[in-house]
Each structure stands twice: as C-alpha cells, then as structure tokens.
Amino acid sequence: MRTIGLFLIFLVVNSPRPSYTAYPQTSILQGVRFVSPDGRYSVELREIDRLSYYAIEDTKTGDVDHSVVMPSLLLYLRWAPNSRAIVAVEHIPHGSCGRVVYLTDSKWADIEVRPPGKELKDSAVVGVTIKADYVHYRFAVRYIQPNGMPIRYAFCDLDVSLETRVISNVRWTPTSRVEWATSLEQKPVYNPPKA
C-alpha cells in the first residue's frame, strides 16, 4: 500500500502542467529604466529593505518617490501618453493583474486592476491597450468552486480612466475552456499608445 501511495505522489508531482504564455517565466528586472514621453519622469524597480518599489524620479528636480510598492514580479510597464501615469501588468498567484500608477497632487499613488466581483476566480491579463485618456485591460477568467474545481470561463474587458482612475465599461463574455486556454497560450497583446 505504501508503494502505491508513493507512486501516486510521484505521479502528481511529476505530471506535466500546461505552460501558458500569459504566465511568463521572465519579468522586468530591477534597474531597467523607463523614461516618460515628455522626459520629465523616469521609473525603475528598486529593492529597499527586501521589498521592491517603483522608484519614480523627477528628472527636473532629481527627487525620487518610493511610495508605491511593487508586490510581485513586473511583467509589463509602459508610460501613458500624458506622462502622469504608468500602466503595468504584475504576476499574482494563478495569473496576473493590472496596475495603474499615477501622479496626483505631486504624489504617486496606484490602483490595482482585476475583474470585479466577489466570486472565487483566477484571472490573467491577455491584452492591454493604452489610449490618450484611458487604458483597456482584457482578462481571461476562470471561476472556481471552493474546492478548486473550475466551473466556468469568461473574458472580462474593462477600461481605467487615467485621470480619475475609475473603472468603467466592464464587459463579460462567456467562453469555453478551450478558448480560455488558447488565450493563455498566446503571448499577451500589449498595444502601446500611438505616437
């Protein structure tokens, strides 16, 4: 009986797992610098006391703001056209989420972006489109039961205002498990702002 139990544990531990491109194996490294379109600000990840922060420098004054913690791996970062907001995608357990870091009253703050609702779900960003005044996120969502079993799949599209940070235009599209998995196997579509 012990041999069968050990074999089953070996089988579970060594079973191949799907490799989804939407859950990338690489992230943006600390020290990589991104300069805003107007050249006024730059941002890079820095570690302080074993925590990663968005280090946002005012290139005019040399002041650096470390008020926004980067809680996970950073998968995507791009400045918004207004140079007053940063659009990001971060790794989270079982997926990824969006984050908008923005300047308000000379301080940097942030909002985490996930599909709304209180139901148990996993979600991953599969698309980002940055416009002049908002950012559009597309998520692949898997709803799960408390025991961890999936029950349905959907895509969630939503917009985040770069001025007010209000989430709007939330649209849910039911999908099949196959379409959901296919969206995760493809490289996420990140559409930067048009120059």
Model feature map: region roles:
Residues 44-49, 88-94, 99, 127, ...:
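Beta-strand C-termini and the immediately following turn/loop, strongest in propeller blades
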Residues 5-13, 20-34, 106-195:
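Acidic, small-residue rich beta-repeat scaffolds with periodic aromatic anchors
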Residues 25-52:
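Beta-strand-rich domains and repeat architectures in extracellular enzymes and scaffolds
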Residues 39-40, 82-84, 133:
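Short coil/turn segments that connect the beta-strands within blades of beta-propeller domains
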Residues 63-68, 110-112:
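A short beta-strand motif characteristic of beta-propeller blades
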Residues 50-55, 94-102, 145-158:
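Structural motif
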